[in-house]
Curated annotation (Swiss-Prot):
Other comment: During catalysis, the active site Cys acts as a nucleophile attacking the alpha-carbonyl group of tRNA-bound glutamate with the formation of a thioester intermediate between enzyme and glutamate, and the concomitant release of tRNA(Glu). The thioester intermediate is finally reduced by direct hydride transfer from NADPH, to form the product GSA.
PROSITE patterns: GLUTR
Name of the protein described by the UniProt record: Glutamyl-tRNA reductase
General function of this protein: Catalyzes the NADPH-dependent reduction of glutamyl-tRNA(Glu) to glutamate 1-semialdehyde (GSA).
Keyword terms: NADP, Oxidoreductase, Porphyrin biosynthesis
Molecular function as annotated in GO: glutamyl-tRNA reductase activity; NADP binding
Pathway(s) the chain acts in: Porphyrin-containing compound metabolism; protoporphyrin-IX biosynthesis; 5-aminolevulinate from L-glutamyl-tRNA(Glu): step 1/2
Catalytic activity, EC: 1.2.1.70
UniProt note: domains: Possesses an unusual extended V-shaped dimeric structure with each monomer consisting of three distinct domains arranged along a curved 'spinal' alpha-helix. The N-terminal catalytic domain specifically recognizes the glutamate moiety of the substrate. The second domain is the NADPH-binding domain, and the third C-terminal domain is responsible for dimerization.
Keyword Ribonucleoprotein: no
Swiss-Prot/TrEMBL catalytic activity: (S)-4-amino-5-oxopentanoate + tRNA(Glu) + NADP(+) = L-glutamyl-tRNA(Glu) + NADPH + H(+)
Primary gene name: hemA
Active-site annotation: 50 (nucleophile)
Length: 418
């Protein structure tokens, strides 16, 4: 039995190829059925995200194994093998285990240390379990990878610092306000960055979110997801005074929030402070706003300096994380190798127990017939000893006759002899 990890990711393949190798949720069951129907495959998990498509497999060794699996992947996606082969990576046993642990820990992600990948790996594992048989070693590998990812996040600072603009904006807000559970946040825009910001804020249980956007329909989809109120851009002037935090990211060529608008809001708030985070390019907030008392304005450049510092911290933490992964992968492989002896150990124990039971029954019968207890126990001990050492004795004698000192020493060691 061999463990494999094969696939493509953002480092090995352009998006034009990655999008052709994805497995959609609607067809995942069909893909797993097809994969597990391959005679060499004992169990499989398919991980498919925007940045990677990977197969994690437990397989029986055979000739041309790599060719057979590449052919299946190409046939399933109707791809030319040469197109895929140049971008495909292939990891086996210890390397496969290490790769999965690195992926689950965020060490192989586009954004180093990002936490979302662990949830994606867990979902891939859960999805592949629905009606599909797993090899026990594959299941154990995934469960171990989950615990390793948790250990990496607990014992290192890999996820402690923001390295995306959206996350940095939320981190800044949490640093300035003791708790987000008492603040109102106005989000201006409804694009991808604001979507990420809104989800981060929801996770931190912000008291109230308001989303202002040019098109109400797009904003409403996000608002329904995070429990926010939707307003139009023209309503910002009137509603700005409610916001303790404003985070803006639109594609507007001109500023949306001006100095006068913020002055009016501060006056209505009796100069309670406002945090404005402008992550738009061009800027959504007039730079002069930063000169107002109690208005704290941060631009995308301010956030970028935070991100650069934090990324350096994450890279240092990644060195510690790699050490953890190497150690855990080595321990897992030691466990896996030990499993190959499990069946032999079970058979040996069963055989010994059978001898014990057989001789015990005879001894008990002799006692019931009134035989001398001491003599019966001595006979039991003598016969049990002889039956149990018979096979090892023959093996020792044969090794000696053959002049096989290496085998003789192995047998001595296995019998606990000095």
């Amino acid at each position: 039995m061999t463990l494999l990890a094969l696939g493509i990711n953002h480092k090995t393949a352009p998006v034009s190829l990655r999008e052709r190798v994805t497995f959609s949720p609607d067809t995942l069951d069909q893909a797993l059925d097809s994969l597990l129907a391959q005679p060499m495959v004992q169990g499989g998990v398919v991980l498919s995200t925007c940045n990677r498509t990977e197969l994690y497999l437990s397989v029986e060794e055979q000739d041309n194994l790599q060719e057979a699996l590449i052919r299946w992947l190409c046939d399933y996606h109707n791809l030319n093998e040469d197109d895929l082969r140049n971008s495909l990576y292939w990891h086996q046993d210890n390397d496969a285990v290490s790769h999965l642990m690195r992926v689950a820990s965020g060490l192989d992600s586009l954004v180093l240390g990002e936490p979302q990948i662990l949830g994606q790996v867990k979902k891939a594992f859960a999805d592949s379990q629905k009606g599909h048989l797993h090899a026990s070693a594959l299941e154990r590998m995934f469960q171990k990878s989950f615990s390793v990812a948790k250990r990496v996040r607990t014992e290192t600072d890999i996820g402690a610092s923001a390295v995306s603009v959206a996350f940095a904006a939320c981190t800044l807000a949490r640093q300035i306000f003791e708790s987000l559970s008492t603040v109102t946040v106005l989000l201006v825009g409804a694009g991808e960055t604001i979507e990420l910001v809104a989800r981060h804020l929801r996770e931190h249980k912000v008291q109230k979110m308001i989303i202002a956007n040019r098109t109400r329909e797009r904003a409403q989809v996000l608002a329904d997801e995070v429990g926010a109120e939707v307003i139009s851009l023209s309503d910002i002037d009137e509603r700005l005074r409610e916001a303790d935090i404003i985070i803006s990211s639109t594609a507007s060529p001109l500023p949306i929030i001006g100095k006068g608008m913020v002055e009016r809001a501060l006056k209505s708030r009796r100069n309670q402070p406002m945090l404005l985070v402008d992550i738009a390019v061009p800027r959504d907030v007039e730079p002069e706003v930063g000169k107002l008392a109690n208005a704290y304005l941060y631009s995308v450049d301010d956030l970028q300096s935070i991100i650069s510092h934090n990324l350096a911290q994450r890279k240092a933490a990644a060195v510690e994380a790699e050490t953890i992964v190497a150690q855990e992968a080595s321990e897992f492989m030691a466990w896996l190798r030990s499993q190959s002896a499990s069946e032999t150990i079970r058979e040996y124990r069963s055989q010994s127990e059978h001898v014990r039971d057989e001789l015990t029954v005879k001894a008990l019968a002799a006692l019931e017939q009134g035989g001398d207890a001491q003599a019966i126990l001595q006979d039991l001990a003598w016969k049990l000893t002889n039956r149990l050492i018979h096979a090892p004795t023959k093996s020792l004698q044969q090794a000696a006759r053959d002049g096989d000192d290496e085998r003789l020493n192995i047998l001595r060691d296995s019998l606990g002899l000095e």
